[in-house]
Amino acid sequence: MKYSRQHHIQQDPDHINVHWDSLTICQLHCSYCYARNEYGKEWGKISSKEIIDGVIESLNRSSLPFNLGLLGGEPTIGPHYYYILDKITKLEKFKWVYVVTNAEKDLTTHPHYDNLAFLFSYHPADCTDPERFINNIKHMLGRGYKCKVNIMLHHDKKLWPNIKAMIETCQGIKGLRIHPHFLYGNTIQKLFNYRKDFWEYFAFLEDYEKDLAYDDELFNDFQVFRDKMTDFQGWSCYNNNYEIDVRGNVVKFCLGKEDNVVNLLRDKNFFNRIEKTIPMICPHKACNCDGLLKQLKVRNDS
C-alpha cells in the first residue's frame, strides 16, 4: 500500500478494549459463527461466579481506562449478566460497556445503566423475528442508549434482498448507526472469499459512513475489504485489544494463544501492569477484524 498511517478517525490508544465471553451459549446456530467454531468442546459453558469475580477484580486494578465488550454466546441470557453490569459500571477506570446482542430476547424490561451501549447483530439466515429485532433497537434508542446495528453480509445470494431490506429499514431509524459486517472464513484470520456478484450487488455500501483514515483519505469497511487494503505486515500496530474467554483466560487479541495466555484468577494484576499501549509488529498479511482495523498502525521505514 502507498499509505504510511492508518486508524479509526476517533481512535484513542491510551485505553484498553476488553472483549469478554462470559458464556458460550446462544439461541441461534449461525453457520459462520467464529466463536462456536473456535470454542469447540468449550461451547455450551457458563463462567462460574468465581471466574466472573476474578475478571471483575482484575479490571478493577487496571492502570488504564477500559471499554468492555460483552460477547459470547449471547451475553443477555447469561445468569450473571446483570451482576456483571452492576459491578463493572461502578469501577473507577470503566468508560463504556458494549453489549453485543442478537436481540432474540425481549429487551424492553432491561434496567438502566449509564455508559452502556448496544451493538445489535442482524443474522439474516437465523433471526427468528425481525420485527422484535427492530422493536428492541427502537426501544433502546428511545431510552437514550447509543445503538449500532451490525448487519451480517451473508454470502448466500438468496438472502441478499433481506439484507438490503434490513439496511433500508435501519436507515429510517433516527439515531441508529449502521455497520455492514463482513464474515470470516474458517478462522478469524481469513475473510470469507466473496464472489464478484456480491461486490456488485452491495456496491451501494461504498457510499456509507467512512471512518477509517489512511493518511488523509477516508474509507469504509466495504471499500477496504473489496480493494484488499488490509495488508499491514511489518507495520507498528498499537493494538490495545484483549479478549477474555469463558474460563477467565486473557490474551492479546490477534496474537497466537499458545504462549500468550494468562488466567485472571491466578494473575489479577494483568491489566494493572499495562500502563501504556506499546506497538506490536503486525505478523499478518491481512487484517480481517473490523475492530483491529480501527487501531493506529504506522508503516516502518525499510
Residues covered by each model-derived region:
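Flexible mid-to-C-terminal extensions adjoining Fe-S/redox cofactors in radical SAM and related proteins
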Residues: 1-16, 249-302
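Canonical Radical SAM [4Fe-4S] cluster-binding loop centered on the CxxxCxxC motif
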Residues: 3-50
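Residue-level signal for mature regions of secreted extracellular proteins and peptides
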Residues: 19, 23-26, 68, 230, ...
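Short cysteine clusters
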Residues: 26, 30-33, 237-239, 253-254, ...
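Cys/His-rich zinc-coordinating "finger/knuckle" motifs
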Residues: 33, 37-41, 244, 261, ...
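Radical SAM/AdoMet-radical enzyme domain recognition
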Residues: 56-69, 78-169, 176-178
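Acidic metal-phosphate-binding loop of nucleotide-sugar-dependent transferases
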Residues: 74-75
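A C-terminal junction/extension of Radical SAM enzymes
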Residues: 171-258
